[in-house]
């Protein structure tokens, strides 16, 4: 009887020891899983290097046009370049700058996000997302933009509709007096289950001074994704080169997401 008791006790101790080892291994595995960088969970869908194909159909103050383009981007570095060409409606009788943000700020999946901010945009693929933007200029000019962004293999596909109206004939847009968009910051926050972005933006003018414009964008993922907390996206958009009439243009953007740089005391 004593031998049987010792045997049973030994077996019980061994079972408890093995169970503890198993639980520790499971905990270690769970901890390692939680530490996997966010980028690795989306990299199977979105590659480190992505191609871009786009088409914009638009109308500004009654002038219709079509622009097509291709490019390349690094979604996890926050940079991309586009080569664009006016296919219909050339030469454009207005400043090209008002179009550029619909191409570059148009795909936030090409923004560099840190691991501690949920990347609403990359999560949305392969289904993709759409967005709508209103641009209100200081001289009462208005732009409405809609874009649908999808994915085919290693390429982002943009279908863009751009409508501008009420630009004064003697204003900086119709007189082509703008030089570039200044660097800016988009405020990102959740409202009614979608992501909203606000920007107070400025165009540098020939001879000095600035031309103000307020952006409001609504981003809608095509599937349920994790929503981010209130954050910011810093971005700079530049025209690298262009021909005389801006029929062919190369654009570049750098964009990085972040929380506030100021520490909280609350």
Curated annotation (Swiss-Prot):
Name under which the protein is recorded: GFP-like fluorescent chromoprotein cFP484
Lineage per the UniProt record: Eukaryota, Metazoa, Cnidaria, Anthozoa, Octocorallia
Modified-residue entries (2,3-didehydrotyrosine), positions: 105
Similarity comment text for this entry: Belongs to the GFP family.
Chain's role: Pigment protein that is green in color.
Cross-link (2-iminomethyl-5-imidazolinone (Gln-Gly)), chain numbering: 104-106
Tissue expression notes: Tentacle and oral disk.
Assigned keywords, A-Z: Chromophore, Luminescence, Photoprotein
């Amino acid at each position: 009887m004593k031998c049987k008791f010792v045997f049973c006790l030994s077996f019980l101790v061994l079972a408890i020891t093995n169970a503890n080892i198993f639980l520790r291994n499971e905990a270690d595995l769970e901890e390692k899983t939680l530490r996997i960088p966010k980028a690795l969970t989306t990299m199977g869908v979105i590659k480190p290097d992505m191609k871009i194909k786009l088409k914009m159909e638009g109308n500004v103050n009654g002038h219709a046009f079509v622009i097509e383009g291709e490019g390349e981007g690094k979604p996890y570095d926050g940079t991309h370049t586009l080569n664009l060409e006016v296919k219909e409606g050339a030469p454009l009788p207005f400043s090209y700058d008002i179009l550029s943000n619909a191409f570059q700020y148009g795909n936030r999946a090409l923004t560099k996000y840190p691991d501690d901010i949920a990347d609403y945009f990359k999560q949305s693929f392969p289904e993709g997302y759409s967005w709508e933007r209103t641009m209100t200029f200081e001289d009462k000019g208005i732009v409405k933009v809609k874009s649908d962004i999808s994915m085919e293999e290693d390429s982002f596909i943009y279908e863009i509709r751009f409508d501008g109206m009420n630009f004064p004939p003697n204003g900086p847009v119709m007189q082509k007096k703008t030089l570039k968009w200044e660097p800016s910051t988009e405020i990102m926050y959740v409202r009614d289950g979608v992501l909203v972005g606000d920007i107070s933006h400025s165009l540098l003018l020939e001879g000095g001074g600035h031309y103000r414009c307020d952006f409001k964008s609504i981003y809608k993922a095509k599937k349920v994704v994790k929503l981010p907390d209130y954050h910011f996206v810093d971005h700079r958009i530049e025209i690298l080169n262009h021909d005389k009439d801006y029929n062919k243009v190369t654009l570049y953007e750098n964009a990085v997401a972040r929380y506030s740089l100021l520490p909280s005391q609350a």
